[in-house]
A protein has these predicted regions:
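Internal/C-terminal transmembrane anchor helices
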Residues: 181-216
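Internal transmembrane alpha-helix with an interfacial aromatic "cap," most often the third helix
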Residues: 34-60, 76-80, 101-117
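Short N-terminal edge-element motif at the start of the domain
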Residues: 237-333
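Structured domain cores in non-transmembrane regions
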Residues: 72-75, 79-83, 91-99, 304-385
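Cytosolic juxtamembrane helix at the C-terminal end of the final transmembrane segment
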Residues: 46-48, 105-126, 158-185
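N-terminal topogenic module of multi-pass integral membrane proteins
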Residues: 1-44
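Membrane-proximal helix-loop-helix units in multi-pass membrane proteins
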Residues: 73-144
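A eukaryote-biased signal for long
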Residues: 203-227, 361-461
């Protein structure tokens, strides 16, 4: 026996609601299932929009759900989407997206009840009460950030139970003689689905290509002519400071090294290879004029093309980080990024340069989150240009003598555009580097020197 048009329609709506209630965070199902669910809800309520006011309201809500779902998926391709999430406008949109599935359930129930009443059929309102209680419980658990399995299964079972109750009402409506007539439409369901898919794909393309990396404020690098700065440069060169690295330093970092006592250098033999380029890492420790005070400098240089240019990150575990160690932090973090193009050098500050404490989810299932602290420098390289390079510097002061300056660096390079949702190289490090090899590549280096001048080669991997 051929299914009625009404049965095809309400089953489509119930399946759409079911897909919205499923959260599977693998194989992109967390995005695919809601997208399919929104499309089914829209096409289902579209056929009911002329029946009564409640079903017409459901059609409007389903259309809004499609838009919110598409926007949510597209935002996954935007690197700095957290800024959008922080806007009050988005919080309102997010709230609407969260409550709409429940609103659609209520609209379907009230719409079917109205049709039954027109046929002198009565139904109880327990389903409506069940929907409200279910949503209230889910809201409370979300506010409390509940992550347990037991209540999770109960919530899913209750959700399925509500859908079954709605299905029973739909069957009762059909038994009461309700017949849904199929009306002609100018745009078919398949074209609506194709349009939504194309719009989503176009949004993802724009997100990846235009907003998948940091927007850096590049300016022409001007060589300083300050006499004091030139005098300090000459003094540093006499102590063995590499000339190429010296020319990359900011004026404030050069002047901070006035009357420096000594320069200790580590040059790494380890490298991170790009498409046809190689990353060189160097570490320097400069003892400043005040005895026991040092400036630590980590410098990087891409010799050649690094390949894909998405996001980069320099993560430093500084010498002062060691618990009960011999060093304390002194002063602020400094640094910049540079590149050359057509004989001109350009420079920009890091998009983010900060010393931060953070939690990593690595092994969180078994051991819980882990507390970490690092210096992070986050940036993006220009789409064209050569000799891409930069440095991060910080100052330390000795608490005790005879302590090694032990400063570790992780340089992370994004090597492909193919990731979803988009995260930065620094976010990958904060999460324990779980996307290393597939999306990112990381190389490690260390500056390990003794203040007396005894030097041990850098350690990398």
């Amino acid at each position: 026996m051929e299914e009625s048009f009404w049965k095809q329609t309400y089953e489509k709506i119930l399946i759409g609601m079911g897909l919205f209630g499923i959260t599977l965070k693998f194989l992109f199902l967390n995005q695919i299932l809601p997208f399919i669910g929104a499309r089914l809800l829209f096409t289902g309520f579209r056929k009911l929009r002329s029946e009564n006011r409640w079903l017409k309201a459901g059609y409007a809500g389903a259309a809004l759900e499609v838009v919110i779902t598409i926007v949510t998926i597209v935002l996954g391709s935007v690197l700095e989407r957290e800024k959008i999430y922080a806007l009050y406008a988005w919080k309102g949109i997010d709230f609407c997206g969260g409550i709409l599935p429940v609103v659609l359930m209520i609209c379907l129930f009230l719409g079917m009840r109205e049709e039954l009443e027109q046929r002198d059929e009565k139904i109880k309102s327990e389903v409506l009460l069940h929907i409200i209680i279910w949503y209230a419980v889910v809201t409370v658990l979300a506010i409390q950030e509940y992550e347990g399995w037991i209540l999770g299964f109960v919530i899913v079972a209750a959700y399925i139970g509500i859908l079954v109750e709605l299905k029973n009402i739909a069957e009762k409506l059909e038994e009461a003689g309700y017949v849904l007539e199929e009306h002609s439409v100018r745009i078919s369901d398949s074209r609506c689905a194709a349009g939504a898919a194309i719009l989503t794909a176009a949004g993802l393309f724009v997100g990846y290509t235009c907003f998948g990396a940091y927007h850096m404020e590049w300016t022409t690098a001007n060589e300083t002519q300050d006499p004091a700065c030139e005098e300090t440069k000459a003094h540093l060169l006499s102590l063995g400071f590499p000339d190429d690295i010296l020319h990359d330093l900011k004026k404030e970092d050069i002047l901070a090294c006035k009357n420096a006592r000594q320069v200790l250098l580590n040059q790494s033999d380890d490298s991170l290879r790009g498409r046809d380029g190689q990353l060189q890492l160097d570490g320097l420790a400069v003892e400043l004029e005040q005895e026991g005070q040092w400036k630590v400098i980590h410098h990087f240089l891409w010799n050649g093309n690094p390949g894909f240019r998405g996001t980069e990150a320099v993560q430093i575990n500084p010498a002062y980080q060691e618990l009960n160690g011999g060093w304390t932090s002194q002063g602020k973090l400094t640094g910049q990024v540079l590149y050359d193009k057509d004989g001109t050098s350009y420079t920009a500050d890091y998009k983010i340069l900060q010393d931060e404490n953070y939690d990593t989810g690595m092994n969180a299932f078994f051991y819980g989150s882990q507390q970490n602290a690092s210096i992070f420098a986050e940036f993006s390289l220009p789409r064209s240009g050569e000799n891409c390079r930069g440095y991060v510097a910080y100052e330390i002061k000795a608490k005790e003598s005879d302590w090694w300056i032990d400063s570790w660096l992780n340089y992370t390079h994004q090597k492909t555009i193919w990731q979803y949702p988009v995260i930065s190289a620094a976010q990958n490090r904060r999460q324990g580097g779980w996307l290393d090899e597939r999306v990112f590549s990381t190389v490690q280096d260390a500056l390990q020197v003794l203040p007396e001048g005894e030097n041990e080669g850098s350690i990398g991997s």
